[in-house]
C-alpha cells in the first residue's frame, strides 16, 4: 500500500513539475473532462464548440486548421470571424493566397467594412504584419490563409528552378518562436490555415503531412483536421458539403473528438441543421416519424421544414441553442460518449 502512495506522490510531483515548466494543460488524463477556464470564440458550429471542450477556439493561443482543397477551411475561419465580430472583437485576415472573396465573406455574416485585410507580397512580410498586429494588443483574432502560400522572399526573388530546401520551415519556426509569447500576453487568437501534402515513398502509415515544417504542430494549442465526406442534396441539386472535423490536438480539453456538420453553399455552416440533430440526439427535440416537435409543438415534417421553421423563429432557435450548449458543455463526457457510440456504429456499417 505504501508503494502505491509513494507512486501517487511521485506522479503528482512529476505532473506538477511538467505543468510548472510547460504550462497548464501540457499533460492531462484522457478521461479528465475538466476543461481549463479559458476565454473562447465560437466557431459557428455548436457541435464543434462542444467537441473543443471549452465552447470554441481559445483566446491567447495558436490554432491550426488543415485539410484537403475545398474542404471548408476558409469557410470555417470566416465563420469564426463572424462570431468574433458579433462579440465586439477586432479581426484581421492575412490573405497570403490572394483569394479572399468579400462577397462570400459577407454572406457568412462577416462585417467586411470592419475586417482588416492584408495581401502580403511574401512570407516574411505576412508574418511581420501578423507580429505587428499581435504586439499592438488591439486585434483579437488574426487569420493567416495559408501557411503554404507564405513564400520566402529568397524564393520569390530567385529563379524558377532554384532549390530552397527548408526555407519555409525555418521561416515558420523563427516566426512562431517570436509570436507565441506575444500572442499569450495580448490574449489574441491566431489561426493558421494549412494545406495537405503527400510524403513520397511512404509504404506504411499515413502519407499525409502539412506544409511549413513541424514548428506549427508543436506551437499549436488546437489542431483541427477538416474533411469533406459527402454532398448535401436538394433533389438532384448539390447545395452543400457534409463536413467532418476531428480535433487531432487539444491542450485545453481531451482531444480526438470529431463532429459532422453541413456547410451550405452561399450560407456557411448550417446551424439550424445542427440544432435539429443535436436536439433529437439529446432529447430536447422530439421526433415522431417524419415530424419534429419542440416543447410539445410541431415545428415541421421532415428536417428541411423543421430547419426552415427555426430560421423563421430565431428566438426559439436561440433558446434551443442555449439549452444544448448548457447541457453539453456542462457534461462534456456525455457528448464524448455519444461521439464514440456514433463512430462505433459507422465502423460496423462500413464493415
Swiss-Prot record:
Subcellular location: Cytoplasm
MF-aspect GO terms: ATP binding; ATP hydrolysis activity; ATP-dependent DNA damage sensor activity; damaged DNA binding; single-stranded DNA binding
GO biological process entries: DNA recombination; DNA repair; SOS response
GO cellular component term of the entry, any: cytosol
Alphabetic keyword roster: ATP-binding, Cytoplasm, DNA damage, DNA recombination, DNA repair, DNA-binding, Nucleotide-binding, SOS response
Listed Gene3D superfamilies: P-loop containing nucleotide triphosphate hydrolases
Annotated binding of ATP, by residue: 67-74
Function summary: Can catalyze the hydrolysis of ATP in the presence of single-stranded DNA, the ATP-dependent uptake of single-stranded DNA by duplex DNA, and the ATP-dependent hybridization of homologous single-stranded DNAs. It interacts with LexA causing its activation and leading to its autocatalytic cleavage.
Family under the similarity heading: Belongs to the RecA family.
Protein name: Protein RecA
Species per Swiss-Prot/TrEMBL record: Mannheimia succiniciproducens (strain KCTC 0769BP / MBEL55E)
Lineage: Bacteria, Pseudomonadati, Pseudomonadota, Gammaproteobacteria, Pasteurellales
Recorded name of the encoding gene: recA
Amino acid at each position: 500500500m505504501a508503494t502505491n502512495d509513494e507512486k501517487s506522490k511521485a506522479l503528482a510531483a512529476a505532473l506538477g513539475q511538467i505543468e510548472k515548466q510547460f504550462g497548464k494543460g501540457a499533460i492531462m488524463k484522457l478521461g479528465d473532462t475538466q476543461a481549463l477556464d479559458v476565454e473562447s470564440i465560437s466557431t459557428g458550429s455548436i457541435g464543434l464548440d462542444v467537441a473543443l471542450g471549452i465552447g470554441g477556439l481559445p483566446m491567447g493561443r495558436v490554432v491550426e486548421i488543415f485539410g484537403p482543397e475545398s474542404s471548408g477551411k476558409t469557410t470555417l475561419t470566416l465563420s469564426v470571424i463572424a462570431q468574433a465580430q458579433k462579440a465586439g472583437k477586432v479581426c484581421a485576415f492575412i490573405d497570403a493566397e490572394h483569394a479572399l472573396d468579400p462577397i462570400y465573406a459577407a454572406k457568412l455574416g462577416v462585417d467586411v467594412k470592419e475586417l482588416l485585410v492584408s495581401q502580403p507580397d511574401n512570407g516574411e512580410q505576412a508574418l511581420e504584419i501578423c507580429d505587428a498586429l499581435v504586439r499592438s494588443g488591439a486585434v483579437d483574432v488574426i487569420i493567416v490563409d495559408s501557411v503554404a502560400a507564405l513564400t520566402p522572399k529568397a524564393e520569390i526573388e530567385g529563379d524558377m528552378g532554384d532549390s530552397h530546401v527548408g526555407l519555409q520551415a525555418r521561416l515558420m519556426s523563427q516566426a512562431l518562436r517570436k509570436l507565441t509569447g506575444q500572442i499569450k500576453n495580448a490574449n489574441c487568437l491566431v489561426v493558421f490555415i494549412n494545406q495537405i501534402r503527400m510524403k513520397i515513398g511512404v509504404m506504411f502509415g499515413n502519407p499525409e503531412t502539412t506544409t511549413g515544417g513541424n514548428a506549427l504542430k508543436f506551437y499549436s494549442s488546437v489542431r483541427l483536421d477538416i474533411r469533406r465526406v459527402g454532398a448535401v442534396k436538394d433533389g438532384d441539386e448539390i447545395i452543400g458539403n457534409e463536413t467532418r472535423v476531428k480535433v487531432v490536438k487539444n491542450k485545453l480539453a481531451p482531444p480526438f473528438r470529431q463532429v459532422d456538420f453541413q456547410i451550405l453553399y452561399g450560407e456557411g455552416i448550417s446551424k439550424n441543421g445542427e440544432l435539429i440533430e443535436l436536439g433529437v440526439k439529446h432529447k430536447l427535440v422530439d421526433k415522431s416519424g417524419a415530424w419534429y416537435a419542440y416543447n410539445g409543438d410541431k415545428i415541421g415534417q421532415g428536417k428541411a421544414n423543421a430547419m426552415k421553421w427555426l430560421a423563421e423563429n430565431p428566438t426559439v432557435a436561440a433558446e434551443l441553442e442555449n439549452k444544448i450548449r448548457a447541457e453539453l458543455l456542462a457534461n462534456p463526457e456525455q457528448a464524448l460518449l455519444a461521439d464514440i457510440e456514433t463512430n462505433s456504429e459507422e465502423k460496423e456499417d462500413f464493415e
